[in-house]
Every structure is written in structure tokens, then in C-alpha cells.
């Protein structure tokens, strides 16, 4: 049997499918997720149910978002899970997670995410951060390093700034390739994202911050002065106390927010 076949399902490359099979890792992830009935529990990409089963067993209802129709059908016919699940067949990148919110209950979102969509999916989920209590995701280890990086680290970038603007980022555990079927070609890691109830550095317009980060990191080897010359002058950098000769990865989240707020003030 092909190594891409697991429990009778052939992993689809276009969906980035790698199924978690290591019980020890599964138990540790479920422990980190801490499923309960006080939140709306949401799984993205339940796949063959490695996390779905233990989480659903611990609670009354689990909402899942799954793109693969074959896997949706398996879940709909699952002898144990079918009565516990609310299934949304569709693309998580297009999904409106705010529709899942129940009065008095925030979301706890988790999943073993397809690595080919993990970064755009993070940006999509940040839009719903105010409705989310916690997020726990299995990701490519490199993405977890980017999410949790500090200024001056080569992994520090646009994703870092936006993630740490919205959330506290906590790496949970590393997961080797042999914990999956088929084994991915990269190391994986689980990360915990805790959206801030009150952001440490509030931005007047998050879209301005997003655009500023995109512009700043477009040419990582260039200085801020070079990359942001269309939006901020040397005098404005001086007002902010930011050295325009620094590179984009040397600037803190707080400083990016300060720059974005100055741009907002100029546009007002």
C-alpha cells in the first residue's frame, strides 16, 4: 500500500494533507487545547479525526471546517463522531468564523493545518481575533519560528509583526516527521496563539499597519529609509525615535505600530 494511503484515504497533495498518527503527540496537543463546553470549539481541517475524536469525546459539540468532500463524508458517517459534529464543508481561507460565535462564548480554534495555506490562513484568522479565546495549530516549524521571532532574528518578518500585534505567541512542542502519515519533508511544531483582550500597542487602523509591514518587508536587505520613503520622512523617523538606517527586521512591533499611527494621523 502507498505510504500516502492512511485509514483507506489517499492523502491529496493539493490539499497539503499529512495525517497525525502519533498518540503521544495527539494527547499532548489535546491537553494544550483544553477542550471545554464554555467555548465554541472549532477545528480547521479535521482530516481523519486524529484530534477530532479525543476533543469531541470531551465536549458536547465540535464545529469543523473541512475542504475535502471525501473526508466530510467520512465524518458524516462516523459511528462515534457524527452526532457530535457540526460540519462546514468549505475553504477555511474564505470562511466567516464570526458566524460561529454564540452569545457569551468565544471560540477556541485548533487544527493540524495544511502547510501550503498556513500563512494566509493566519492572516485570515487575525481578522476574527476579538471573537477568539485561543488558537492551537500544528504548523511547519519554520512558520512557528517566524510567528515567535524577536527583532533582529532572520525569521522576523511581516507575519511576526501582525501575529504579535494581535496575539501572545507561545511555542508548545516540536513534532518530528515520523509522527505523520505520509511523513512531511519538514519538521513541524505546535503553537499557541492567545489574542489580546486589550492590545499592548493599539493601532488606529490595522489596515495601515498591514500595508506598512508589507512595504517595509518587501526588500528585507534595504533600510527603512529606502523602503518607506514614500510614507515617512527622515524628520518623522526622528520624531518617532526610530533610526531609518535600520533594516525592517530590526524594528519592534511597538515601533511598527507607532509608524502606522503616524501615517494614520497624516491621512486624517
Curated annotation (Swiss-Prot):
The keyword Mitochondrion does not apply. GO terms for molecular function: 16S rRNA (adenine(1518)-N(6)/adenine(1519)-N(6))-dimethyltransferase activity; RNA binding. It catalyses: adenosine(1518)/adenosine(1519) in 16S rRNA + 4 S-adenosyl-L-methionine = N(6)-dimethyladenosine(1518)/N(6)-dimethyladenosine(1519) in 16S rRNA + 4 S-adenosyl-L-homocysteine + 4 H(+). PROSITE patterns: RRNA_A_DIMETH, SAM_RNA_A_N6_MT. One of its GO terms (cellular component) is cytosol. Keywords: Cytoplasm, Methyltransferase, RNA-binding, rRNA processing, S-adenosyl-L-methionine, Transferase. It comes from the Bacteria. This is Ribosomal RNA small subunit methyltransferase A.
Amino acid at each position: 500500500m502507498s505510504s500516502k494511503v492512511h485509514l483507506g484515504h489517499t492523502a491529496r497533495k493539493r490539499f497539503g494533507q499529512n495525517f497525525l498518527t502519533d498518540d503521544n503527540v495527539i494527547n499532548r496537543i489535546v491537553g494544550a487545547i483544553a477542550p471545554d463546553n464554555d467555548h465554541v470549539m472549532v477545528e480547521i481541517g479535521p482530516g481523519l479525526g486524529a484530534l477530532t475524536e479525543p476533543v469531541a469525546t470531551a465536549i458536547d459539540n465540535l464545529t469543523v471546517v473541512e475542504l475535502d468532500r471525501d473526508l466530510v463524508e467520512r465524518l458524516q458517517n462516523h459511528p462515534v463522531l457524527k452526532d457530535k459534529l457540526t460540519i462546514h464543508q468549505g475553504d477555511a481561507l474564505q470562511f466567516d468564523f464570526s458566524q460561529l460565535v454564540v452569545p457569551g462564548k468565544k471560540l477556541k480554534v485548533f487544527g493540524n493545518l495544511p502547510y501550503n495555506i498556513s500563512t494566509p490562513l493566519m492572516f485570515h484568522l487575525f481578522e476574527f481575533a476579538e471573537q477568539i479565546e485561543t488558537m492551537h495549530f500544528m504548523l511547519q516549524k519554520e512558520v512557528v519560528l517566524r510567528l515567535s521571532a524577536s527583532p533582529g532574528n532572520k525569521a522576523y518578518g511581516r507575519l511576526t509583526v501582525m501575529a504579535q500585534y494581535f496575539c501572545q505567541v507561545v511555542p508548545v512542542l516540536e513534532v518530528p516527521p515520523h509522527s505523520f502519515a505520509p511523513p512531511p519533508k519538514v519538521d513541524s511544531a505546535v503553537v499557541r496563539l492567545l489574542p489580546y483582550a486589550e492590545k499592548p500597542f493599539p493601532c488606529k487602523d490595522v489596515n495601515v499597519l498591514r500595508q506598512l509591514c508589507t512595504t517595509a518587508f518587501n526588500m528585507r536587505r534595504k533600510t527603512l529609509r529606502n523602503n518607506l520613503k514614500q510614507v515617512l520622512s527622515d524628520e518623522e523617523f526622528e520624531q518617532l525615535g526610530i533610526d531609518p538606517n535600520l533594516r525592517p527586521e530590526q524594528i519592534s512591533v511597538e515601533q511598527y505600530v507607532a509608524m502606522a499611527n503616524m501615517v494614520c494621523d497624516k491621512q486624517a
